[in-house]
UniProtKB/Swiss-Prot annotation:
SUPFAM superfamilies (UniProt xref): Class II aaRS ABD-related (SSF52954), Class II aaRS and biotin synthetases (SSF55681), TGS-like (SSF81271), ThrRS/AlaRS common domain (SSF55186)
Pfam family, one: tRNA_SAD
EC number: 6.1.1.3
Family: Belongs to the class-II aminoacyl-tRNA synthetase family.
The keyword Cell membrane belongs to this UniProt entry's keyword annotation: no
Molecular-function GO terms, alphabetical: ATP binding; metal ion binding; threonine-tRNA ligase activity; tRNA binding
Name recorded for this polypeptide: Threonine--tRNA ligase
Localization per Swiss-Prot or TrEMBL: Cytoplasm
PROSITE patterns from the UniProt entry: AA_TRNA_LIGASE_II, TGS
């Protein structure tokens, strides 16, 4: 009879098989009432799961880390049940859990409207309030296919037809609705208390643009209403901060159908871009990098040698001229090896740090493009370090120092690190992998960095560190990468003469900090809601006149600011000063310098910030010094 080991180490002995719900009830009726699911010997199962043998058990409640995925998956089924109740001719397809929520795809003769979503959500609340029991049963594959065909659910039958014949399938029923699912699910619909449908969009069946278009309804679900409200607030804030809206409102950039996924930078947006590049260039010089430039169009022979032609061909833009095939480079790594290979290298030349603001193109699907966050033409802050195995740790430690310093200057202090470790299929010996993984760990320990191991998630050619930023809304953005590469240098015949005179292959370290300039700018715009730090603002100060009598003085102030390296402008229009202040505040200009007759007489300016703070009257030299010091301090403000 089963002995059940609980998380606190206690072992409960039972005289007969029993369900997880029964175990919870044995501990306390309150726990039984709160139980959502269980984890038996590490596997998530329903509370109705029958325990027959000795096992370890964790009872999952709303407070457990596993609860949200179960709640969201169950809510996706609740959505499908509501849609079928309101629109019986709709066919169900798939309904997975995604970050912060779920979606469900439906085949329906028309697009769902916002009014439809309101009706569906109301029906979901009705079904949740009914507290319908959720039960599980198994069916053989062929029976399941016929079952769904009889229901008129052709898409579901097609999904099951792709499953191996000998596999038993589980179905979950709630009320008169039953759906295919591995589970687990909450015990009843009454556990689903806090959810919201967020939007509807089109989606191709099985993600193939050659297939029919389905209707995808997105939603979010949480354990309680407070968490839901907090999430919806963050969602509302994210909508306000959408870099695409702010890019238009602040006249930074735009996109056009004539060049999908490629940015048209306006003067102010390009100013920010140039400031980013200037900043990164200076930091790289400080850390001993040599900047290079490599071609945009490269013969396919190089991509074949590097392995990109076989594995990345569909994402490359390819052209043909004079009977030769070329690819627009999707990444800079193979070209950097060509520069390394130009001339004999000795161990004394290592480490060799090469950097490039690499202009890359990738043929991303049009449906995946998303403002600056997902583009086809991006500039990456690429760097490749060629070194010996013994130099990996010191080089990675130096990279981490640079990563932390750069992110701090941009105002990001909460960084998450992930170490992707060896996969099953890999190149290189275990000894080499041991050495590389240990070097990465020691480098992070040396910087007092905490990280999460990701076993099996490294590339086949080496382990890597992923660096992710947390923005003001708590969203995580993976930007930086430090990747060890044992493969490409050998594939492209890179070598150096070792101290003993032998010919050796260097290790190649791929390194990016921003990731791509475009995406990083999108992150910055949303993080700061367009109110970029002074040093990044395209216009740092604007001089506003009260009347045309101050025009000459305003020009003098602007020129003085510009001579001090401050990006300044003026507004001489014959408009009320309140109108000017409001307009330039909406443009997120950090400092508004108002000049009237009194300021002209005393060679001063009245200083206001974009947040409406009155800093009083200052001399021109004082405001120049104030702004210059703030610019120098960068993200530490």
């Amino acid at each position: 009879m089963p002995n059940v080991k609980l998380p606190d180490g206690n072992v409960k002995h039972f005289e007969a098989p029993l369900t997880i719900y029964d175990v919870a009830h044995h501990i306390s009726p309150g726990l039984a009432k709160a139980a959502i699911a269980g984890r038996v010997d590490g596997v998530l199962v329903d509370t109705s799961y029958l325990i027959k043998e000795d096992c370890s058990l964790i009872i999952v409640t709303e407070k457990h880390e596993d609860s949200l995925e179960i709640i969201r998956h169950s809510t996706a089924h609740l959505l499908a049940q509501a849609v079928k109740a309101l629109f019986p001719s709709a066919q169900v397809t798939i309904g997975p859990v995604i970050e912060d929520g779920f979606y469900y795809d439906f085949a329906f003769e028309r697009s769902f409207t916002p009014d439809d979503l309101s009706l569906i959500e109301a029906k979901m609340h009705e079904l949740a309030k009914a507290n319908l029991s959720i039960t599980r049963r198994e069916l053989p594959r062929n029976e399941a296919i016929q079952y769904f065909k009889d229901l008129g659910e052709e898409y579901k039958a097609k999904i099951i037809a792709d499953i191996p014949e000998n596999e038993a399938l589980s179905l979950y029923r709630q009320g008169d609705f039953e759906d295919l699912c591995r589970g687990p699910h909450v015990p009843s619909t009454g556990f689903l208390k806090a959810f919201k449908l967020t939007k509807v969009a089109g989606a191709y069946w099985r993600g193939d643009s050659n297939n029919e278009m389905l209707q995808r309804i997105y939603g979010t679900a949480w354990a309680d209403k407070k968490s839901l409200e907090e999430y919806l607030f963050r969602l509302e804030e994210a909508e306000k901060r959408d870099h695409r809206k702010l890019g238009k409102a602040l006249d930074l950039f735009h996109f056009q159908d004539i060049a999908p996924g490629m940015v048209f930078w306006h003067p102010k947006g390009w100013t920010i871009y140039q400031e980013l590049e200037h900043y990164m260039r200076n930091r790289l010089v400080d850390f001993g990098y040599q900047e290079i430039r490599t071609p945009q169009l490269v013969d396919r022979s190089l991509w074949e040698k590097s392995g990109h032609w076989a594995n990345f061909r569909d994402e490359m833009f390819v052209t043909e001229t004079e009977n030769r095939h070329y690819a627009v480079k999707p990444m800079s790594c193979p070209c950097h090896v060509q520069i390394y290979n130009h001339g004999l290298k000795s161990y004394r030349d290592l480490p060799l740090r090469l950097s490039e603001f690499g202009n890359c193109h990738r043929c991303e699907p049009s449906g995946a493009l998303h403002g600056l966050m997902r583009v086809r033409n991006m500039v990456q802050d690429d760097a490749h370090i060629f070194c010996t195995e013994d130099q990996i740790q010191s080089e990675v430690a130096m990279m981490l120092e640079l990563v932390q310093s750069v992110y701090k200057d941009f105002g990001f202090t909460e960084i998450k690190y992930r170490l992707a470790l060896r996969p099953e299929k890999r190149v290189g010996s275990d000894d080499v992998w041991d050495k590389a993984e240990t070097a990465l760990k020691l480098a992070m320990q040396g910087r007092n960095i905490e990280w999460v191991d990701a076993p099996g998630e490294g590339a086949f050619y080496g382990p890597k560190i992923e660096c992710s930023l947390s923005d003001c809304l708590g969203r995580i953005w993976q930007c930086g990468t430090i990747q060890v590469d044992f493969s490409m240098p050998a594939r492209l015949e890179a070598s150096y003469v070792a101290e003993d005179g032998s010919k050796q292959t260097p290790v190649m370290l791929h390194r990016a900090i921003l990731g791509s300039f475009e995406r990083f700018m999108g992150i910055l715009i949303e993080h700061y809601a367009g109110k970029l730090p002074l040093w990044l603002s395209p216009v740092q100060a604007i001089v506003l006149t009260i009347s045309e009598k101050q025009n000459e003085y305003a020009e003098k102030v602007r020129k003085t600011l510009q001579k001090r390296g401050i990006r300044a402008n003026f507004d001489l229009r014959n408009e009320k000063i309140g109108f000017k202040i409001r307009e330039h505040t909406l443009q997120k200009i950090p400092y508004l310098l108002v000049v009237g007759d009194k300021e002209v007489e005393n060679c001063q300016v009245a200083v206001r910030t974009r947040d409406g703070i009155d800093l009083g009257v200052m001399t021109i030299d004082t405001i120049c010094d104030t702004l210059t010091q703030e610019i120098i301090r960068k993200g530490s403000i």
